[in-house]
């Protein structure tokens, strides 16, 4: 285990210039990768564009994954009242110099983990999603409707 390593995604990847929402006859999917999970506004914009399921494809290191992976994913599900399907690579990434975390999971709009795979295991998940839960949660907790982006910040200094 290489517990003290990190991976600078920006050294190997180039950022995109738009968010992607894919519409199918069954559902709409907001697509994202790895480091994107740290940007809540991105997921809010995809949700406002109609995403019902937020997909995160990642390659988190073990230390970062253990500390942040599930918490970030549950936050994105709750903030947007969406399902989250998050897949993370497993095993040693010799060429990148770190061990990947794994722990693929599916989370519902309440933030409940519906299914997951242990952090060092390779497996497949099959989960039936009840998309009607999205509207139920959004009715009970209308976060997206109650957002007040017009408010200003007033800073007070000593």
Write out the residue ranges for each language-model feature.
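Proteins with a high burden of low-complexity, intrinsically disordered sequence enriched in S/T/G/P/A and R
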Residues: 1-8, 102, 107, 157
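A broadly conserved detector of short glycine/acidic/proline-rich loop/turn motifs that flank catalytic sites
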Residues: 26, 35, 110, 130-131
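CN hydrolase (nitrilase-like) catalytic-core segments centered on the catalytic cysteine
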Residues: 28, 38-124
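A short, acidic, flexible beta-alpha connecting loop/helix-capping segment that sits on the rim
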Residues: 120-122, 130-133
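A short C-terminal boundary segment appended to hydrolase-like catalytic domains
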Residues: 132-158
């Amino acid at each position: 285990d290489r517990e003290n390593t990190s991976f600078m995604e920006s050294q190997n990847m180039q950022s995109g210039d738009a968010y992607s929402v894919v519409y199918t006859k069954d559902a709409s999917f907001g697509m994202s990768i790895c480091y994107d999970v740290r940007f809540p506004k991105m997921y809010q914009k995809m949700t406002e564009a109609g995403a019902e399921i937020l997909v995160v494809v990642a390659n988190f290191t073990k230390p970062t994954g253990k500390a942040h992976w599930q918490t970030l994913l549950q936050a994105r599900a709750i903030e947007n009242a969406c399902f989250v399907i998050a897949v993370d690579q497993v095993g040693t990434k010799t060429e990148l110099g770190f061990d990947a975390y794994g722990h693929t999971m599916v989370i519902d709009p309440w933030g409940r983990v519906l299914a997951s795979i242990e952090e060092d295991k390779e497996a497949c998940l099959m989960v039936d999603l009840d998309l009607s839960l999205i509207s139920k949660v959004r009715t009970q907790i209308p976060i997206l409707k109650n957002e007040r982006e017009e408010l200003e910040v007033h800073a007070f200094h000593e």
